[in-house]
Amino acid sequence: LEVPSEQADLGIEVILKLFSREGLSPLTPKGGTSNLSDNAKRIVALWDEYLKTIDSVIAFLQGKNPTLALQICQEDYLPEASRFAQLEELDWAFGTMGTQDKAKHLATLYLEDISDFIVECVDENFGFSRYAERLGRSANSFDELYEALQKEPTYIDGILLSILEEKIARIQPELMLISVPFP
């Protein structure tokens, strides 16, 4: 057909934008924390450390800085909230597997801590995969999904929309196809 085409995974692009110093900075907690869980309060207390480490951790997970594994495996590099509670068994689990695997595991716990904070304080529908999946899966009708679409866009929706707008402006497509991951 000789139709020029481009493909983009906006889900990955949103995660990479959100999980960056630039993406997390606007979420810097302001005001009181009395209505937050103990876990969220801990993350708030360590927020500056999350901002200092997020870009390097993402680069490590993308394979761009494998030497960071040694630092990540040191107890004082990553800020730690509730996802790190089960670390007693870490040496047993990773003792023979090596530093890279252990660092990837710790970096994943770190991202999951941030994700827990985002779900509690920013966007209850956030998740690393199948964002807002609950809306599509549990619906007997489209009423709940329709109501969700009528709400103001969340911070994460804003990231998605800005990436989409940039792509449309750059590519100027005549036709656009979108895959929607709802069952």
Segments the model singles out, each with a brief description of its role:
Residues 1-183:
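A short, structured N-terminal alpha-helical element that caps or precedes a catalytic domain
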